[in-house]
Amino acid sequence: MSMVKVIEVIASSDKGFTEATENAVAEASKTVKNIKSIYIKHMNANVENNKIVSYAVNANISFEIEK
């Protein structure tokens, strides 16, 4: 039987939601092993002068706990 733990993270990008999601996994993987999935809870974009300047995701990352 495996155990899975979930952490909540926020990540951003100036290029898009896909890159923000990839940044979330990349940063989490620096300290967490065995990442299995990412669930995007919220997405938002910051706007300045009628243009999107950054994208952000609030996500849950699931990873398997080693025994």
Identify what each model region corresponds to.
Residues 2-36:
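Short, well-ordered alpha-helical segments
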Residues 44-67:
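A cross-kingdom feature marking charged/low-complexity
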Residues 4, 38, 54-58:
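Structural motif
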